Design a protein with these regions (language model features):
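Mid-to-C-terminal "cap/lid" subdomains and adjacent gly/pro-rich loops that border
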Residues: 1-92, 165, 169, 179-180, ...
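C-terminal structured subdomain/cap of oxidoreductase catalytic cores
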Residues: 1, 96-152, 178-289
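Contiguous hydrophobic segments
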Residues: 7-32, 97-99, 106, 111-117, ...
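Surface-exposed beta-strand-to-loop junctions
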Residues: 8, 116-122, 155-158, 170-173, ...
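Alpha-helix boundary/capping detector
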Residues: 163, 170-171, 233
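Short acidic alpha-helical/loop segments enriched in Asp/Glu that coordinate divalent cations
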Residues: 151-165
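Intrinsic-disorder/low-complexity, polar/charged segments
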Residues: 130, 167-175
Length: 289
């Protein structure tokens, strides 16, 4: 079937592939912890008692430990809030309901593997290295199980195939999650965190790599923590901010109402996407960004 014909199929009888959300589905809900489970206070209390040094590699620098503790303090405060989501529930309208942790407490690592700069480094997502993550994931699966058992979902024939209704204890559910979970749902972040050096940061507030002159990092790796949602819009915002600030260095900072960047002092043809730059005169001294 030609791609352009797909919308017409939906017009005829309200069915067809265009009526089914694609690639992972649409979000059903972004749930705060207290909407996931009534045991949220016990989960938070248990998490606050865990020694962070036991969760990191034995050779982790003290700055990494300090940064991790600072992040856990922030995250556990958010776990208490009725307005901060910790789980995303997505449904493709077909045969799969996905549950994603959007404020995980676990932390991974990235290490040099060899002296060959071409070889890839060693990544370890550290999935479920913080035991609270598994507690939250278990509670979230049980919440989704209750939802799929509701009358409206049963009316459309919802049934559970994995892990299966026979898997009922928290211990068994947690085991099934460990076996079936993936470490990242196409949203890896935070390998070059924008933090102070005292907290284990890699780049500063201008995204300059500490200790390396002339090198910046501009992507999702600079997020100190995973954003509580999808990453694309935040990546766009970071790139837009950096591109604008970099343009100021060379005097290219004119900004027109039609949302096109133009070199300062240039003439802009409103009827075209082309810029006429015969009179390129920077209106300020190049900065130090």
């Amino acid at each position: 079937m030609p791609l352009k014909a797909l919308p017409r199929v939906s017009d005829v009888d309200g069915a067809g592939p265009m009526t089914i959300p694609y690639f992972g589905g649409s979000s059903v809900a972004f749930l705060p912890l207290q909407n996931v489970t009534s045991d949220y206070q016990d989960i938070i209390a248990s998490a606050s008692l865990i020694n962070v040094t036991s969760l990191l590699p034995t050779n982790a620098d003290q700055t990494i430990t300090a940064g991790y503790q600072a992040q856990l303090d922030i995250l556990l405060d958010l776990y208490k809030s009725p307005h901060a989501a910790v789980e995303e529930v997505a449904w493709e309208g077909g045969n799969t309901v996905c549950v994603a942790m959007i404020r995980p407490l676990s932390r991974g690592s990235i290490l040099i593997n060899t002296t060959d700069p071409i070889k890839p480094p060693v990544f370890d997502f550290g999935t479920f290295s913080h035991p609270t993550d598994l507690d939250v994931a278990t509670a979230a699966l049980k919440k989704v199980r209750d939802w799929t058992a509701s009358v409206p979902m049963q009316e459309i024939g919802a049934s559970e195939t994995y892990p299966g209704r026979n898997i009922s204890s928290d211990h068994d559910i947690a085991g099934a999650i460990r076996q079936g979970a993936v470490s990242s749902w196409q949203h890896p972040t935070s390998t070059c965190s924008m933090l102070t050096r005292e907290l284990g940061g890699v780049v500063d507030s201008k995204l300059r790599v500490y200790g390396v002159k002339g090198l910046r990092v501009v992507d999702a790796s600079i997020f100190p923590m995973a954003v509580a949602g999808h990453t694309s819009s935040t990546v766009y915002a970071v790139a837009e901010k950096v591109s604008f600030n970099c343009s100021r260095v060379v005097g290219l900072f004119g900004y027109h109402a039609n949302r096109h960047f133009a070199p300062a002092g240039s003439r802009y043809n409103q009827s075209s996407t082309e810029m006429s730059c015969e009179k390129l005169v920077p209106q300020r001294r190049p900065g130090s960004y």
